[in-house]
Amino acid sequence: MSRLSPLDKYRNIGIMAHIDAGKTTTTERILYYTGVSHKIGEVHEGTATMDWMEQEQERGITITSAATTCEWNDHRINIIDTPGHVDFTIEVERSLRVLDGAVAVFCSVGGVEPQSETVWRQADKYRVPRIAFINKMDRIGADFFRGVQMIKDRLKANPVPLQLPVGKEDYFKGIVDLVRMKAIIWDEESLGAKFHEEEIPADLLDEAKEWRDKLIEEISSHDDALMEKYLGGEELTEAEIMAAIRSCTINIQIIPVVCGSSFKNKGVQNLLDAVVDYMPSPLDIPAIKGIDESGAEVERKADDTEPFSALGFKIMTDPFVGQLTFIRVYSGVLQSGSYVYNATKGKRERIGRLLKMHANKREEIKEVYAGDIAAAVGLKYTTTGDTLCNEDQAVILESIEFPEPVISIAIEPKTKSDQEKLGLSLQKLASEDPSFRVKTDEETGQTIISGMGELHLEIIVDRMMREFKVEANVGKPQVAYRETITKKVKVEGKFVRQSGGRGQYGHVWLEVEPQPEPGKGYEFVDAIKGGVVPREYIPAVDKGIQEATDNGVLAGFPVVDVKVTLIDGSYHEVDSSEMAFKIAGSMGFKEGCQKAGPILLEPIMSVEVVVPEEYMGEVIGDLNSRRGRIMGMDSRAGAQVVSSMVPLANMFGYSTDLRSATQGRATYAMTFDHYEPVPKSVSDEIIAKVKG
């Protein structure tokens, strides 16, 4: 079976935007006009085809990026709908990694909103060509030109309008096409399916000519042949203009801007035309690079004759077919039922079935080709970011980077019977979402889950209940404290028991001191001379001390960074045993800790906040109030970057506070840096709380 549409007719695009810019509605309309759905799904009625997880319909936000295929002007368009909430940046990041281009949706009233800045930076990172769609032109306060200006100012991009709106707010009825110099007007009755072309209204003609000149000037500045023609006063043909816009868009020299109102069904067909005309096909973007088994860099071109290579970019659990692995095929062909090699894990996998996804319907296909996006059933080992390829021509494609989780909570099942289900459901969710981790706390035996933010964990707990029917209680976010000492002391540990028959006798002298530099951990030195403590008992002393480090003397937290030297002791021919020396070591160490100035340590996080200039003051003030230290400032892409060190204990609720303090325009990244002593007043409070 040969491929249905040639590679140059493929468009793999994402739709990215701020939370309420109308992303899902735009995707819905695209599916409606390309003939995939027969009834328009409205987000605020909770029936959108793309938002198919129950929570998404309730909350009206898109959480998981659904992949959908549709056809327009005999081109095949694969669309990935991405979430706009800051806790889900991982979803956006992984979709951008496998796309060739993106449509950025902006609200004509709000313009460039906070999340758009974050998503835009992510798209810059992967060099994804973009088209801007200024949506909601029918809203009160809609302003197309302000939107264009904000793309320039806030995102430091080069927006070039290809259309102008005809009328605005309630009177928005069509657009002026600056390439063809025609007006396109929609009629209200046919849900936007019917529109007609007419001459540009007289009151818009001068403005249209002015913007068309700007467009031609911009594209010819990147093309010498056009520049000559333009400067020589010759008219450029429509085909020349379109070819130049296409090449400038693919090289990210310009961002073409179109407009419309998805909700009112206007402008969506022209957006689709722009995707087909100006977005790259898999052939237009640089061949993907990877590393072969010898460690050398190799390229895989988008071609069916090249060896097969693909990247798994999303795992989903589907109630009917089980686990789906979404893959983007970069080169070669893959048949269902065949074997592939997971180069990242070094495992062979069998592809059960291959599905083409239409939002939440699925169509079974026999094979996928270079440039395709499809879902595979039956992969056991593949997780997000893994490379699939031919075993004899193995390659590892550059993977997706995942941020470290920043918040943890303890979770326990409400009933005994849920215990096993809890473990299984958490494992499944963790395999779908690499930014979510599960571990068991050795000290308390609790299950601890960690993620990218409070909303992220809320949704995970919610999904456990809905999809796996597991009811769970969730604790408060927790901090992992440690204990250490500050002085060097010499102590005696003596354990003597005499009660008829054989007694117990263990006796040691220890020097207990802090390590010269933090992070060195526990160290045991044997300095016994002349056999005052026999050889065979020394490991027991060490073991006793090590066990005692599990529970500190202040509040029972693990003791770190101590050096213990065994300097002296005595033994009894009959009564001494390993057990006695183990207890003596542990007693001596505990007493040593009491005398050696014990202190609490807390995890200090390195926090980087990217914030627009005007909110700098609030952000710095807030970090200081959280016992933070500002380490430096720096400007990046029109925003300020504040680096600081802040105790983890003071960072709970931060994403919510930061969002409200900066109207959501700031983003932050937090990573663990080091442990540091807790100030006395704070540590007294913690100890009192623990001892209750």
UniProtKB/Swiss-Prot annotation:
UniProt key word GTP-binding: yes
Q: Which positions fall inside the tr-type G domain?
A: 8-283
GO terms classed as biological process: ribosome disassembly
Enumerate the InterPro entries for this protein: EFG_II (IPR041095), EFG_III (IPR009022), EFG_III/V (IPR035647), EFG_IV (IPR047872), EFG_V (IPR035649), EFG_V-like (IPR000640), EFTu-like_2 (IPR004161), G_TR_CS (IPR031157)
| Compartments, as annotated in UniProt | Cytoplasm
One Gene Ontology cellular component annotation held by this UniProt entry: cytoplasm
Which key words tag this protein in UniProt? Answer: Cytoplasm, Elongation factor, GTP-binding, Nucleotide-binding, Protein biosynthesis
Q: Name one Pfam family in it.
A: EFG_III
User: Where does the chain bind GTP?
Assistant: 17-24, 81-85, 135-138
The protein's GO terms of the molecular function aspect are: GTP binding; GTPase activity; translation elongation factor activity
**Could you tell me what this protein does?**
Catalyzes the GTP-dependent ribosomal translocation step during translation elongation. During this step, the ribosome changes from the pre-translocational (PRE) to the post-translocational (POST) state as the newly formed A-site-bound peptidyl-tRNA and P-site-bound deacylated tRNA move to the P and E sites, respectively. Catalyzes the coordinated movement of the two tRNA molecules, the mRNA and conformational changes in the ribosome.
Q: What PANTHER family is this protein classified in? A: RIBOSOME-RELEASING FACTOR 2, MITOCHONDRIAL, TRANSLATION ELONGATION FACTOR G-RELATED
Which family is this protein grouped under? Answer: Belongs to the TRAFAC class translation factor GTPase superfamily. Classic translation factor GTPase family. EF-G/EF-2 subfamily.
Q: What is this protein called?
A: Elongation factor G
Tell me what organism the protein belongs to: Trichlorobacter lovleyi (strain ATCC BAA-1151 / DSM 17278 / SZ)
User: Corresponding gene?
Assistant: fusA
